[in-house]
Amino acid sequence: MHWHNNIRTRSRMWIAILAVVVTATGLLVKRSLASDHQDTADVELNPSMDMTDVYAFPGSAAGRIALVLDSWALLTPAEAAPGVTSFDDNLLYQFKVDNTGDAQEDKVIQVTFHGSGADQTIEVRGPMAPPVVGAMRNTVADVAPTLSGKVATVLGSASGMQVFAGPRQDPFYIDLEQFFRIIPDRKPVTGPLSMLPDTPSASSFRAPGAAVDILGGSGGHPFNVLSIVIELPASQLRGSTDKIGVWGTISR
């Protein structure tokens, strides 16, 4: 059993019940109502722990589910180039699944990385019972990896688990430039958005049709994240019912 010292955890809990059955998987999934990018000074100074979003949605075929954990907000295209920005090999990334309705993880998928740059590799363990339950835990299960290989490569099979880890365009939509004009004390300390005024210069978001998807590049500033994407049979996560809760943690 392996340990990392100086435990620090970022968690994103999916807190509201999705009102639509995910028919492709037969699951009801709990979902988040919020997204956070550089939401504290601590994660802005430690961007590898900045978990921006967690997603769960039907997979590429019936009976499959896709899970996504995005981190390291506001990467520029240059920073997201192959081998430039790496996952932190001192961190434990986890998808946690509650399939009994008690808001505690019943299954986890653990992801760790080794090395950096273009030669970085990934190991995925699970889904399995958690070695330890709770947010402030970074114990890596003492089991063989389910999948392993190089980052920025699709690993696994379409009938079992498939994994991709690497830079991708941030899928979250927000008129971030206007947000920082409304609340300038939340703007980043580096990068193009740091050049916005230090005092409020707007009082509301732009009208529909005029809003700019800054993260998607509509304003000339395309941003990326480091994504961990896992697709697998939904039966591997399901409990006695078809309702699951999914959240993510990043622990040091």
Each model region followed by its residue ranges:
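Bacterial N-terminal signal peptides
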Residues: 15-26
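N-terminal secretory signal peptides that target proteins for export/translocation
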Residues: 1-10
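A detector of low-complexity, intrinsically disordered, Ser/Thr/Gly/Pro/Ala-rich segments
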Residues: 7, 21-23, 38
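Surface-exposed extracytoplasmic segments
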Residues: 29-252
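Hydrophobic alpha-helical segments, especially transmembrane helices
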Residues: 9-13, 31
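Structured catalytic/translocation cores of nucleotide/phosphate-coupled proteins
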Residues: 3, 26-28
